[in-house]
Amino acid sequence: MGLSWTVPLEWGKNLSASNPLGFLPDHQLDPAFRANTNNPDWDFNPKKDPWPEANKVGVGAYGPGFTPPHGGLLGWSPQSQGTLTTLPADPPPASTNRQSGRQPTPISPPLRDSHPQAMQWNSTAFHQALQNPKVRGLYFPAGGSSSGIVNPVPTIASHISSIFSRIGDPAPNMENITSGFLGPLLVLQAGFFLLTRILTIPQSLDSWWTSLNFLGGVPVCPGLNSQSPTSNHSPISCPPTCPGYRWMCLRRFIIFLFILLLCLIFLLVLLDYQGMLPVCPLIPGSSTTSTGPCKTCTTPAQGNSMYPSCCCTKPSDGNCTCIPIPSSWAFAKYLWEWASVRFSWLSLLVPFVQWFVGLSPTVWLSAIWMMWYWGPNLYNILSPFIPLLPIFFCLWVYI
């Protein structure tokens, strides 16, 4: 026996109609109550409404127009009727423990009250207790012994150390690994930057060289050739088809030789300053060092130096003379002595130079004045060599 729903077509009249899909308003039908037209109170729905209000569009859980205002598919709850209600949250239960939470740490009693036996120890009692193998094993787990008589008891620390000795050390520190990788990368980046800057030195010097031939004007290479005429361009960037290309290559080659000579001079000065050029000085009264059988050094060098500290020569009288080699600037002193012998007037400059250096305020004022007057021109000339300064500094520090 199926259930049916009564549709009120007219006022006060109810007819029975089937509700197979359940989309019509929900009304409770009790077959035992024998609901029919003669019994109008057949509907047990407490939220029932007259038919004109049922035709109104209600706002329910499925949006406007989907759920009737008197229940339906979702039942009779306030949410299904389109009414949102917020229930207050239940208050937390009252705590019965009034001592909850972190309590303050009680003050520790004095050592004489908590450990009275520790106050009775002294140096003598401690050394006597160390005679016990068990106690000594706690203080000397690695087997150390001051008397060499007592054998300590092996402890857990000794077992762990033996295990690590068999299986290897723990994982290495990642900070050391990172620094080991970043160091070479930074050096490589700095080297690449200096290389790119050094490659610009020939072009800068070439531009300065060519500007000397075009005083008061812009250096322009016409570049006219019978085979392949080209437009006007800078003389420092001539194409291979330009007649000025060979002169540009020649200038670049001379500039490279000049830079190489400058680096060699700097390296020579550095080695001479470090004392790595043991040059025999000139014997007073002679222009050259004579060659003879006793030219080798007969006095050993002082300290751990691998270079001789003196040089023995055989002058014209036949007697060997040993002259000590300066520990620094030996080659420079040799060149100065050689130049003083060749050009006697250089010796007259020594007192003047010593006097001028002694006047330090005058020297500094003169240097400041010269830099103020010639500074811009010197900067334009020396600016191409600025990338070489870091290389010279590294050589000076690490050699």
Swiss-Prot record:
Keywords: Acetylation, Caveolin-mediated endocytosis of virus by host, Fusion of virus membrane with host endosomal membrane, Fusion of virus membrane with host membrane, Glycoprotein, Host-virus interaction, Lipoprotein, Membrane, Myristate, Transmembrane, Transmembrane helix, Viral attachment to host cell, Viral envelope protein, Viral penetration into host cytoplasm, Virion, Virus endocytosis by host, Virus entry into host cell. Glycans are attached at residue 319. Isoform M is N-terminally acetylated by host at a ratio of 90%, and N-glycosylated by host at the pre-S2 region. Its main location: virion. The chain crosses the membrane at residues 181-201, 253-273, 348-368, 375-397. One of its GO terms (biological process) is virion attachment to host cell. Residues 2-173 are annotated as: Pre-S. GO terms for cellular component: membrane; viral envelope; virion membrane. InterPro entries: HBV_HBSAG (IPR000349). The large envelope protein exists in two topological conformations, one which is termed 'external' or Le-HBsAg and the other 'internal' or Li-HBsAg. In its external conformation the protein attaches the virus to cell receptors and thereby initiating infection. This interaction determines the species specificity and liver tropism. This attachment induces virion internalization predominantly through caveolin-mediated endocytosis. The large envelope protein also assures fusion between virion membrane and endosomal membrane. The middle envelope protein plays an important role in the budding of the virion. It is involved in the induction of budding in a nucleocapsid independent way. In this process the majority of envelope proteins bud to form subviral lipoprotein particles of 22 nm of diameter that do not contain a nucleocapsid. This is Large envelope protein. It comes from Hepatitis B virus genotype G (isolate IG29227/2000) (HBV-G). The gene is S.
